[in-house]
């Protein structure tokens, strides 16, 4: 038993093929694992991962165990492996290395890899590593109080004129408001003519009415309309009446008549000794929101719509009267038959008349369409103006 025991004690221990050196991953830099000494070198075996992810230690540091081959090399290698009959690629690689041993020995020898040297190199690199620099943004110093105040005042002066954008001026704002809220008003235009100084309580009476007038006296309780009287000395007189000048000036017919009124027969008028007058009765403008049915129901039927808007009048018998003849709204309600003096001839243009001597007599502008006759005690019989307009 003793020899056996001695043999057991003296028997050499089997050669250690592997020496495991537990190193941390931060020390060797080969990844999270342990360094295992194998025949011919060392490997870095990954902890908690498969063996194929481990690395081998070479003269130039740890490298992957798996070798990636190019496509032509992989084809040739697998062809050798198949011809050798090996089932693993590593066996084919060992055969190739053995056959090329003489050529490999002729190569220069490389120093073996020492893990201690690698650890010292990594420690020195970590100690010499410089701290990373970070950029710090330094804010500029705040301006002085005086500079801040001047800067703020300058900005207020620059922005004072541009409080509203250029497109938002007063005109555009007014147009925008009118587009959303239309205002039905006829007194929005302003003219340089003086306003009416008469009473405006009878503006409602100046509605659609067309009536001729004769030599009948006007009613004393009514005011005078606008009167233009043309004389032989080519003078023009104006008298404002109850109707406002703005409302009468808005009518397009009034603008046409105003352009047509011109007296160029001064010499002929002096020789004939006659006097022509132009009477302008300024009716109030109808409100645009009144419909035609409302107007007819309020004011009664119209006498005539065929009566020309312009009529010439000329009466040589009134030469002894004053040159300024007035006409009132009550005078328009008198239903005198419209009479054309013998010395007046109507031209082809309605509303223009000439005297027998060929002189221009003048224009007769009707005051308004007849309405509100019952207020003045007039009857409702139709006027002769409509029949006279069809001559």
Curated annotation (Swiss-Prot):
Alphabetical GO biological process terms: leaf development; leaf senescence; regulation of DNA-templated transcription; response to auxin
Domain named TCP: residues: 49-107
Subcellular location: Nucleus
Listed GO CC annotations: nucleus
Main location: nucleus
Record's function text: Plays a pivotal role in the control of morphogenesis of shoot organs by negatively regulating the expression of boundary-specific genes such as CUC genes, probably through the induction of miRNA (e.g. miR164). Participates in ovule development.
Tissue specificity comment: Expressed in cotyledons, particularly in the vascular region, in leaves, roots, buds, flowers and immature siliques.
Keywords: Developmental protein, DNA-binding, Nucleus, Transcription, Transcription regulation
Protein name: Transcription factor TCP3
Record note on quaternary structure: Interacts with SPL. Interacts with KIN10; KIN11 and FLZ3.
Gene Ontology MF terms in the entry: DNA binding; DNA-binding transcription factor activity
Composition-biased stretches (Polar residues): 381-391
Entries under InterPro entries matching the protein: TF_TCP_subgr (IPR017887), Transcription_factor_TCP (IPR005333)
Region described as Disordered: spans on this chain: 1-34, 122-168, 317-345, 363-391
Superkingdom of origin organism: Eukaryota
């Amino acid at each position: 038993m003793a020899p056996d025991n001695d043999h057991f004690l003296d028997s050499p221990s089997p050669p250690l093929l592997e020496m495991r050196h537990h190193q941390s991953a931060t020390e060797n830099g080969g990844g999270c694992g342990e360094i295992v000494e194998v025949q011919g070198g060392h490997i870095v075996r990954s902890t908690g991962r498969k063996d194929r992810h481990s690395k081998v230690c070479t003269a130039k540091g740890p490298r992957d165990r798996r070798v990636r081959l190019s496509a032509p090399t992989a084809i040739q290698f697998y062809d050798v492996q198949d011809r050798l009959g090996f089932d693993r690629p590593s066996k084919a690689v060992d055969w190739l290395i053995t056959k090329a041993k003489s050529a490999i020995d002729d190569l220069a020898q490389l120093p073996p890899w020492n893990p201690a040297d690698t650890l010292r190199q990594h420690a020195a690199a970590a100690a010499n590593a410089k701290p990373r620099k970070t950029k710090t943004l330094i804010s500029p110093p705040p301006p002085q109080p005086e500079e801040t105040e001047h800067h703020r005042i300058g900005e207020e002066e620059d922005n004072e004129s541009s409080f509203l954008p250029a497109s938002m001026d007063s005109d555009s704002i007014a147009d925008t408001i009118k587009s959303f809220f239309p205002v039905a008003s006829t007194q929005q235009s302003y003219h340089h003519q003086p306003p009416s100084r008469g009473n405006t309580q009878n503006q409602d009476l100046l509605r659609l009415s067309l009536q001729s007038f004769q030599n009948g006296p006007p009613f004393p309780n009514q005011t005078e309309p606008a009167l233009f009287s043309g004389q032989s000395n080519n003078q023009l007189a104006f008298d404002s009446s109850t109707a406002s000048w703005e409302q009468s000036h808005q009518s397009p017919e009034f603008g046409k008549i105003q352009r047509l009124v011109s007296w160029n027969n001064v010499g002929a008028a002096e020789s004939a000794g006659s006097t022509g007058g132009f009477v302008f009765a300024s009716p109030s403008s109808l409100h645009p929101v009144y419909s035609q049915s409302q107007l007819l129901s309020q004011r009664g039927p119209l006498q005539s719509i065929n009566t020309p808007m312009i009529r010439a009048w000329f009466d040589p018998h009134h030469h002894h009267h004053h040159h300024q003849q007035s006409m009132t709204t009550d005078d328009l309600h008198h239903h005198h038959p419209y009479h054309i003096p013998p010395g007046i001839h109507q031209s082809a243009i309605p509303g223009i008349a000439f005297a027998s001597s060929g002189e221009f007599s003048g224009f007769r502008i009707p005051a308004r369409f007849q309405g509100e006759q019952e207020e003045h005690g007039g009857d409702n019989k139709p006027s002769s103006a409509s029949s006279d307009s069809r001559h």
